[in-house]
Amino acid sequence: MDPSSPQHPSQDSPRPTQNLSAGSRASLSHRPASRKQSSDSTSNNKNAPIPDDEHGADMPLTMSASVVLTSLPRDAHQALADAEAVDKGKVTVRFQPLASAPILKNKVFKISASQKFETVVKFLRKKLDCKETDSVFCYVNSVFAPGLDEGVGGLWRCFKVDDQLIVSYSMTPAFG
């Protein structure tokens, strides 16, 4: 039978229903009956607020009174040691010319991992004998141009190819 027929009015139907007694109205699923408080304890606690936990402190602590660690956990020491070890070594950088950029005689160089990418760009400008007015555009893996303040060690760790940081360069913008 069609649910929108008068015998079975739909839930959203704007049609007036037939005169029904109060007992038959309570049995309709789309008409809420008057709400009674149930004696069931689960329904009484359903809308009750969650009580606050007592932590034993009457007044909030200031930042100067907060707990200070006297030593770091072992795993934190290892994580710090691993992070520092990345920036202590040397990184191999391979320069690749793009478009009509001049080709370097030696394309592979080593640089300290703690240096910023700015050092790589300055070194490349020096090798290419660029004037101060000349532009050099550098891209890692021919994909993106890193910021000058990026660490070479972090770039190498994330984007190395065959343990080398591939830096493509051009005298004109090569990519958007």
UniProtKB/Swiss-Prot annotation:
GO terms for molecular function: Atg8-family ligase activity. GO terms for biological process: autophagosome assembly; autophagosome maturation; autophagy of mitochondrion; glycophagy; piecemeal microautophagy of the nucleus; protein transport. It comes from the Eukaryota. SUPFAM superfamilies: Ubiquitin-like. The keyword Membrane applies. Gene3D superfamilies: Phosphatidylinositol 3-kinase Catalytic Subunit, Chain A, domain 1. One of its GO terms (cellular component) is autophagosome membrane. Residues 1-59 are annotated as: Disordered. Residues 1-14 have a biased composition (Low complexity). Residues 15-27, 35-47 have a biased composition (Polar residues). Belongs to the ATG12 family. Forms a conjugate with atg5. This is Ubiquitin-like protein ATG12.
